[in-house]
Amino acid sequence: MSLKLEVKTEIKLDYQGFQNQINEFHKRINDKNSPDINFLGWNNFPEVAINPQEIARMRKIVENLHQNSINVLVVIGIGGSYLGAKAALDFILGLGPFENKPEVIFLGNSLSSTDLYQKIEYLKTKNFAINVISKSGSTIEPAITFQILYQFLIDQIGEKLAKTRTFVTTSIKSGELLEIAKSNELEIFEVIESIGGRFSVLSSVGFFPLLFAKINVDEIIQGAIEAHKKYSTSSISQNLAYKYALFRFLMYKNFNYKTEILISYEPFLIYFNEWWKQLFGESEGKNLKGLFPASAIFTTDLHSLGQFIQDGSKNFFQTIIYIKKPKFDLGIKKLVQFNSKINKLSGKTVSEINFQAFLATTLAHSSYGNNPNLVLEIADSSPKTFGHLVMFFEKACAMSAYLLGVNPFDQPGVESYKNELAKNLGWDR
């Protein structure tokens, strides 16, 4: 998979002055004696992240579910426990709607009673299974949802059958969810201790939902392996992941930009953008430091945010993901019933016009709007490309956080709201 990176800005950037720092942090990411080795399982790929025996077990389970007409999987999880899988499904399949295909529904990522109620109403007519994902089981959103949905499944089909349709992805060492799974004799998949949630899509956390949806997980793994090798050098000129990390750092530190907007030209990248926001937001946003990760989908958001991006305050830069080959395309035919200027576009395809919009917008924002633009061009939206892009961003994120002087692998600020909520509820986490 080819990934191209192009910077469009008048700002002069000196990358080579940082090579020694990059070398130091590269060693920290890759050295087996790194002080952060207990958080680097995602980078020990595929040896630590991939469990072939567990994937084989998942395949058999999925095959059995499909043979028994279980056509809906409800994934219960929040943050990294669902964003990666949702991003992958949309990236690879598109947004549909789909007929006669396995469906994956995501719950437990909010405390909305309305959303939960409406999805349960939908499930009343479906044959469904549950995959609850939580390292410990003490996160309130998925914990509540699992309790409600598991009871609903028992009411629908009985406890004995419900146990055969409920799958738990959690730590195999300890935790409340592990104890629940064991005491109820539920199937368990492993959350690897050395892989944090936001880095976990290329592991069992992401693979079971993807296998259920008949995604080619082997191709995802192959794409990630290729990216892992490609971005294994410390050379800034040869490692685009590190070059992207350094570009972000320079925008923040040397030129005082506070926000990075990740822009895509395909609606099916909405949740990829959300995954990226968690990856960088939780990894960098600490010690009063870090770029605020925002996102937009063009051309849709050009009709809401376009004015601000062009003429508003200049505290942001843009990173653009552009997919060279669309999944599908449509030609525009002349319609004699319409006496319209749009008829002049007949003979073109929708993707050709989208590409011209990308070129025009990038020029307008970078040249006339004075917004630095970094373009990441990818070949397609295949499973292999997804695996490659995830590994690219994960490596870039670790380097970017180290350059910033923060720990990429903790998220102490998230605990603050959790602890206060537990106090309000009188709940012992």
From Swiss-Prot:
Q: Which GO terms describe its cellular component?
A: cytosol
Pfam families per the UniProt record, alphabetical: PGI
* Enzyme Commission numbers on file: 5.3.1.9
Q: Where in the cell is it found?
A: Cytoplasm
Query: Would you say which domain of life the source belongs to?
Result: Bacteria
Its job = Catalyzes the reversible isomerization of glucose-6-phosphate to fructose-6-phosphate.
Identify this protein by name: Glucose-6-phosphate isomerase
